[in-house]
Amino acid sequence: MLATNTYLSTQDVFPEKSQTARGLYDLLLSELCKLGSIHEIKKAISISFSSDNQKAFAWVILRNRSIKLVFRTNHRIASQRIQSVTHVAEKNYDHTILLDSKTAIDDELMKWLGEAYQTSK
C-alpha cells in the first residue's frame, strides 16, 4: 500500500528528468510497495520513504538518467555496489548506491531495503 504525503506533484519532481530516471523510480516504488505500507514524501530535491510510523528508511535524489538511493540500516553493509557508508548515529548507517539501470533494482538491493524498512519500524 502506498500513501503519499506530498509537497509537490509528481510532475514537479520529474520536470526535466529523462524517461530513464522516471522508469527507474516507478520500478523502485513498485518493489518498495511489496515490503508493506509505504509513505512517500516528495520534496524539491528528494523523495523519502517511510513505514507506518513515519520514520524514513530510504531517500532518493533524482538525477537526469539515474537515481541516487540512500537507505538506513542498523549495521554496516559491505559491498562494492555501495558508493559510501555514513555512520549517522549509534546503530544507524546510511548507505548510498547509484541506480542507473533496472537491473540494479535486484534481489540483493531489495534485501537491503527490506532490512532498512524493518529497522524503521
Predicted regions and their residues:
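Charge-dense, helix-prone N-terminal extensions
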Residues: 1-121
